[in-house]
Amino acid sequence: MVNQTHEFLLEMTGVSKEFPGVKALDKVNLNVRPHSIHALMGENGAGKSTLLKCLFGIYEKNEGNILFLGKEVNFTSSKEALESGVSMVHQELNQVKQCSVMDNIWLGRYPKKGFFVDHDKMYRDTKAIFAELDIDIDPKVKVATLSVSQMQMVEIAKAFSYDAKIVIMDEPTSSLTEKEVSHLFTIINKLKEKGCGVVYISHKMEEIFAICDEITILRDGQWVDTRPLKGLDMDQIIAMMVGRELTHRFPEKTNTPKDVILEVENLTALNQPSIQDVSFELKAGEILGVAGLVGSRRTDIVETIFGVRERSEGHIRLHGREMKNRDAHEAINNGFALVTEERRSTGIYGNLDITFNALVANVDEYKTQMGLLSDKKMKSDTQWVIDSMRVKTPSHQTHISSLSGGNQQKVIIGRWLLTQPEILMLDEPTRGIDVGAKFEIYQLILELAKKNKGIIIISSEMPELLGITDRILVMSNGRAAGIVNTKETSQNEILELASRYL
């Protein structure tokens, strides 16, 4: 598939990019070999996205050279890059959902028979690509009917159809099950066998060690190092990424659980399949983890408690008082807060500033007697969120979408703390966040527990649950399979419980 006359398929050398007042990239290098999977790592804000935008012509670089197959290139669009053999599978998949799979692959370059589209050839060509990549999807079904992992496979097949030499994958496993991740890795390895160079961007260290051959690390817009992965360990990579040694992945636990403040008894959601007969207690100052396989209905628990999912039976008691929580507004007034899993779609208002995003859950607090909003109080509370959550931002007016994932998440947590909750529920709070920012969010969570908040954390990352929680509620197929003390349990025990009702 790929002509191997060059040591590197892609050579980005000394690439710099400046924005007004900010040097986003400062002489960055990225060299990708054929037959290799190359990890590109760095904290959010390290410059990974900016570097790739310079490659695809979305940003114009200020200096540096880009060689592709030995020739200097300056792509002016993603389309030009794709047609030349450089493809990107995005975290947010850009597909025409109401069109068929094969339409999405051949869009804009349909095979023709006379004046008409040759659907038979399009079908045959799609089937041939799928067979080569071991993809089992009907080319004629609508993309809207596919799972996220299948949509990603369609994107990879599209890159393959363009005879891509470089395939860039941005956080490809963020929404996949373990089985789907395993299948994706098989397909990525097939691309490697055929001579492609795959650039793999992920915050998941385990994946980097499982699949990658080389690694390039960026920090604060600068190139730190490029090395073979063999011989490196996790601590060395983290130290290069953050510029200091993180001696522990998790802060020291200094919270002390006290009296029970929340009792959940026989909680069952109205619209099944969902949670059934779930019971647990939560103490003041306690961090309770919720574990389970994908599809175990972990999120349904916090949604039902928060009133966004209707319950058919069960009791929620806070300090012994029965809580109805018929909707989110009532739940907020009763002292509950929920940081949702999908930060981009249900957490932030991307085209609005930090002030709006920090205060939106608490607007009534800023109304004066005349019904106007108090600018002074709004400024003061926004500053409180920025200071107490340690948000890195130029100003209150900065659009939240321009912040790194870790800083966006801190603003969301700060937003809910302004409502003065007693129970804070966090669904996948560190998904898509780099290792340094994760540590800061763990610190914030522990500080809140020390202030006697009751905290519930849902996470798919087992080390996270074992590193930060006091107890873990394990869900299996919508039912509580057991509650374990974190200090006394193991990954194997949790996985056994998670399979109990399958």
From Swiss-Prot:
TM spans (from-to): none
GO MF terms listed in the record are: ATP binding; ATP hydrolysis activity
> Residue span of the signal peptide, if any?
none
Q: Which SMART domains match?
A: AAA
Quote a single Gene Ontology cellular component term. plasma membrane
SUPFAM superfamilies, per the entry: P-loop containing nucleoside triphosphate hydrolases (SSF52540)
- Cite the record's note on assembly: The complex is composed of one ATP-binding protein (MglA), two transmembrane proteins (MglC) and a solute-binding protein (MglB).
Protein family membership? Belongs to the ABC transporter superfamily. Galactose/methyl galactoside importer (TC 3.A.1.2.3) family.
Instruction: Write out the function statement from the record.
Output: Part of the ABC transporter complex MglABC involved in galactose/methyl galactoside import. Responsible for energy coupling to the transport system.
What is the protein name for this chain?
A: Galactose/methyl galactoside import ATP-binding protein MglA
